[in-house]
Amino acid sequence: MKIKNILFKTSSVLWILWGLVHILAGVFTMTFVLSGDYSGAIAGIADAVDPSLVQMDYPAAAGAVIGQHGFNLFWIGIITFICAFFIWRGNKNAIFLAAITGGLADLGYFLFLDLGGFVNFVPGTIMTVISSAAIITSFYAHFHGNKKKKKA
């Protein structure tokens, strides 16, 4: 098997894992919000923060914002999960759609939650490492795997 195919398959597996984790996180977040447990949703997201520090009465608008975040986690996970099956075969559009969707989602996560010190390495930061690795492997395969050797 060519290295290009191995890289596409590696990227696909990484995006499947990343997508499933985000689908699940979205479902959990929306479930907390829909049950009125806004503190539980926040504690689930900012898992490095003592849950007692976020235990309070939040206005319904805050719950709506957190619920929207959960929905975003869910659909971003769905998109990257679906893209993974197309990346397996080297589909250029899927490579870029997953990179833009998952990559930008994790950039925001990194800037506001990781750098803020609000999350633990697992599962949060490791997911950023996984999406970065998925992007790098698929981009490398796409941009360098198609080069033909020049004849001397």
Q: Where are the model-predicted features located?
A:
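Topology signature of small-to-medium multi-pass alpha-helical membrane proteins
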Residues: 1-152
